[in-house]
Amino acid sequence: MKEKIKEKILNLCNLCGKCVPVCPSYRVYKKESFSPRGRLFLLSHEIEHKSFEFCLFCERCERICPHHIGFPTFYLEKLKEKENPLLTFLNLNNFINLINLKKELPTKIMKEEGDIIVYYSCGLKYLYPSALERFEEILKKRGISIGVPKGLVCCGAIFLNLGLISNLKENALKNLEILEKTKGYLVIFCATCLWMFKKIYPQVFKDTKYEKGFIELSKRAISAYNYLSLKAEDELKILEEKKLRENILFHLPCHLTEDFNLVKNKIETRDFCCGSAKFFLWLKNFQKENKRLWVKNLENIEILATFCTGCYLNFNALLKKPPLILHWLELL
């Protein structure tokens, strides 16, 4: 590991332990080595440990830390130094088939240019396309057009979870090539995709010729909910009204926290970690263990609405109906 990274960890982490109780993997395993504090200690002493793979990249440790340092940021720097590891690849289709995929919106009906740009993510294509339909209907009434450029690919979060940084970079560069030719807000419907664009891309390409391009792109990225709060705030009142009439729980994904803080008073949410859609953790049965920590939130809940593709997949795989799993904006 680079000396400056080791030095930063040792200088900034004062071992206060605020990060320990908020870490999902620590809450399951109750071992210091599985806490952010323990991982940072091991990382700073160049000790490889199996607990590193149990990091969910949720960044709860960073948000609560007095110095705003967290294990994921430093772990990503370490992953950048490595070649892609030899991994046993899972058949992604087997995981996706745990839920009933909805039909992808026909791309021929979507214009490539508009007043704003929508990142056509995996979730929008296959899991909750009606969220985009509803979003477009609302903006159309206000004379705002959306553009969905062709050729956009997965944000690469799946590669980050597998430690495949070169594959992540490949997808990021494809998206940059297309999106830097566009203008206006880049509206994103998935919390993890938003996190990738706003934080991970700039960090992965730091000190490269692409850094500036990704920083500019990150400034344009905004959640679809936040954008509606700016342009159609009255429409969002429907969500709170429905919550009062029906047994709906609005789940706040880990990666939406910072963006959502800008508008958090407009809807009541529950903040808990789904356990990540990281495939390695499914192999270790982590998600089922972690479920015990959050399932108590769902008593008498008929609809569980989230804003993240990974959470959407996890909830569908772990829960029997009810509750029905939806995207927030499908309820508009």
Residue ranges and their predicted role:
Residues M1-S33, R39-H45:
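Long terminal accessory regions outside catalytic cores
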Residues L10, F34-F205:
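Iron-sulfur-cluster electron-transfer modules
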Residues L10-V28, E53-G70, S121-K125, G151-L162, ...:
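Local cysteine-cluster metal-coordination motifs and their immediate loop/turn environment
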Residues I116-Y119, K125, A224, L228-K266:
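Basic- and aromatic-lined ligand-binding clefts that recognize polyanionic substrates
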Residues E177-I178, E302-I303, N316, P323-L332:
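Active-site anion-handling motifs in enzyme catalytic cores
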Residues K183-Y185, N300-I303:
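Short active-site oxyanion
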Residues T208-E240, T269-S276, K320-L332:
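Short, flexible loop segments at boundaries between secondary-structure elements
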Residues F286-E302:
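A short, acidic, amphipathic alpha-helical segment used as a generic capping/interface helix at domain edges
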